Amino acid sequence: MKFIVKLYPEIMMKSKPVRMRFTKMLETNIRNVLKKVDEDAKVQRQWDRIMVMVPKHKPELAQAFGERLACIPGIAHVVQVDEYSFESVDDIYQQALPVYRDQIAGKTFCVRVKRTGDHDFNSIDVERYVGGGLNQFTDAIGVRLKNPDVTVNLEIDRDKLYMVTKRIEGLGGFPMATQEDVLSLISGGFDSGVSSYQFIKKGARTHYCFFNLGGAQHEIGVKQVAYHLWKTYGESHKVKFVSVPFEPVVAEILEKIDNGQMGVVLKRMMMRTAARIAERLGIQALVTGESLGQVSSQTLTNLNVIDRCTELLILRPLIAMDKQDIINESRRIGTEDFAKSMPEYCGVISQKPTVKAVLAKVEAEEKKFSEDLIDQIVAQAVTIDIREIAEQMDTRITETETVIAIETNEVVIDIRAPEEEEHKPLNIEGVEVKRIPFFKLATQFADLDKQKTYLLYCERGVMSKLQALYLIEQGYTNVKVYRP
């Protein structure tokens, strides 16, 4: 069993050297991701596609491989195929007949062939021969070239025949690390999660900068979002997570800055700080989730004033998107429930915020800040490899909160994503196991029986620790981590 990875069309349009570089990078990215699923994964690059071989002795890995490939940037689509050898067009038909006989019974169908190599026949010859045979010797209703019930997809590569058993749509975009790095300002809400995803999809290693206004609980929630985005869509490369203690800045704004200018000044201070951090990391652009007119600080005038605080490029991929479209996209990429449960920390709320800030007036207000405020904030910022989030959680969860045995009145909650749970169900004899995906746990935990203790389970223990810590920070004491 194999997967044939089709490159995103924009990659195919590149010049030969660029196309080769992109394809080689995509091959490396796929290998990095799939090796974490199974060390026996084999990946082979060709000119216009990449072949992924499922180990013959581990056919059960096909589903896991397919799910990972669907989330790797740079892929148009993936087809799962079975491989056969052939010597003639009749060989192709004879091997297709038992595979598709039952699938097309009582249905209309057509045959589509893609061919590579030198043969004494063309693709249309194969389509006619195989289609005619299937039409004559099966219980199919007949051939329909437009909108058939079943499409028989065959790929011929020299002396190999591939019968397509499944098609998986990819993310599109460019392979990770083919573009330069960006630093995304992430708050855990709908907008910043989607804007971060947009640049991951575009092939930019996306690092995260979080301005902490709400203490440990807020930071834990945002780390969950960042970790989910990285783990799902960008796992092939290491990225940084930077946490900036921003309460001192908010305190000075509330104490010293004119009420109407607070929102714009806050954003300018964030951009200044993020720019300093980006330069320290060798990053040339910031990414924000701002959308035109969504709030008072996001008018064109105010965005222009905000941009004047730094020479660093500020990118806003959501600038023309409607809020509902952003929410819909967050649902699709798996960050919606995180955003719904994220506490709102509006550290600076202006009663009459300006929508037409004047640069000179804003700069005059900013002179009221302590001279070394930004220096202090940048010095106190904590930068970690996003993979260290798991280790960080280990130091914050005590031994009594991590268990390997289950006692009476304890319920296990399997928080894995639905596709993971279906692939490898968790069944424990004599123990109640609830299935609540990690991205819904924060909103559903309050509805559970408070008299019981809940043990959170996931495959590697990372997300279960994050979720447990988040719930503990919210005041729940009946939650532990289950690590059998």
UniProtKB/Swiss-Prot annotation:
Pathway(s) annotated for this protein in UniProt: Cofactor biosynthesis; thiamine diphosphate biosynthesis
Residues annotated as the enzyme's active site: C458 (cysteine persulfide intermediate)
Binding residue positions for ATP: L185, I186, K267, G289, Q298
Enzyme Commission identifier(s): 2.8.1.4
Reactions catalysed: [ThiI sulfur-carrier protein]-S-sulfanyl-L-cysteine + a uridine in tRNA + 2 reduced [2Fe-2S]-[ferredoxin] + ATP + H(+) = [ThiI sulfur-carrier protein]-L-cysteine + a 4-thiouridine in tRNA + 2 oxidized [2Fe-2S]-[ferredoxin] + AMP + diphosphate; [ThiS sulfur-carrier protein]-C-terminal Gly-Gly-AMP + S-sulfanyl-L-cysteinyl-[cysteine desulfurase] + AH2 = [ThiS sulfur-carrier protein]-C-terminal-Gly-aminoethanethioate + L-cysteinyl-[cysteine desulfurase] + A + AMP + 2 H(+)
GO cellular component: cytosol
Subcellular location: Cytoplasm
Main localization of the protein described in the UniProt heading: cytoplasm
Gene3D superfamilies: 3.30.2130.30, HUPs (3.40.50.620), Rhodanese-like domain (3.40.250.10)
Signal sequence annotation: none
InterPro entries in the cross-refs: Rhodanese-like_dom, Rhodanese-like_dom_sf, Rossmann-like_a/b/a_fold, ThiI_AANH, ThiI_fer, ThiI_N, THII_Thiazole_biosynth_dom, THUMP_dom
Keywords for the protein's UniProt record, in alphabetical order: ATP-binding, Cytoplasm, Disulfide bond, Nucleotide-binding, Redox-active center, RNA-binding, Thiamine biosynthesis, Transferase, tRNA-binding
Alphabetical GO biological process terms: thiamine biosynthetic process; thiamine diphosphate biosynthetic process; thiazole biosynthetic process; tRNA 4-thiouridine biosynthesis
Gene Ontology molecular function, alphabetical: ATP binding; CCA tRNA nucleotidyltransferase activity; tRNA binding; tRNA-uracil-4 sulfurtransferase activity
Domain THUMP, chain residue ranges per copy: 63-167
Location of the Rhodanese domain: 406-484
SUPFAM superfamilies per record: Adenine nucleotide alpha hydrolases-like, Rhodanese/Cell cycle control phosphatase, THUMP domain-like
Covalent S-S links between cysteines: C346-C458
Top EC class of this enzyme: transferase
Family: Belongs to the ThiI family.
Job of this protein: Catalyzes the ATP-dependent transfer of a sulfur to tRNA to produce 4-thiouridine in position 8 of tRNAs, which functions as a near-UV photosensor. Also catalyzes the transfer of sulfur to the sulfur carrier protein ThiS, forming ThiS-thiocarboxylate. This is a step in the synthesis of thiazole, in the thiamine biosynthesis pathway. The sulfur is donated as persulfide by IscS.
Stored PANTHER family: TRNA SULFURTRANSFERASE (PTHR43209:SF1)
The protein, known as: tRNA sulfurtransferase
Organism field: Shewanella sp. (strain W3-18-1)
Lineage start: Bacteria, Pseudomonadati, Pseudomonadota, Gammaproteobacteria, Alteromonadales
